[in-house]
């Protein structure tokens, strides 16, 4: 991490800080951003193109990323993003694993021209894996950010991983459900 780099501007920090302090038991909060706050994809464009650290993500600069995540967590908000061409559900870590907010990066509506994959180099599950998918659990991304991968939709299905996300807020139970659907699936 380099000193002097910023991720969010001062107005954005101020807004998140003030918004986060407004607590109302009947309100659930979400922060929307163009892209995720970590390197949630390893392979870009093809299975032969492994990136160590994706500079197209908001995973850097780390100080800026961590400051933003702390504000999102203090607001008791979830993070919803796009732009990564790979649907993921990640529990962010700031100082330690899982001490940050939850994030859902929704899939791309079209994903067959520049796909991305979650594919750890060692092809092993991380610690605390839920065993639902082969490569979930605790990992460090290419920027050394702590992330816990809970779900991902690699482009190895008929839909190439393209689709859309639905986020359901249950105010009574104080629960958020992230759903990922193939592009042509009618979920009515």
Model-predicted segments: where are they?
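Long, structured stretches of catalytic cores involved in phosphate-ester chemistry, encompassing
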Residues: 1-188
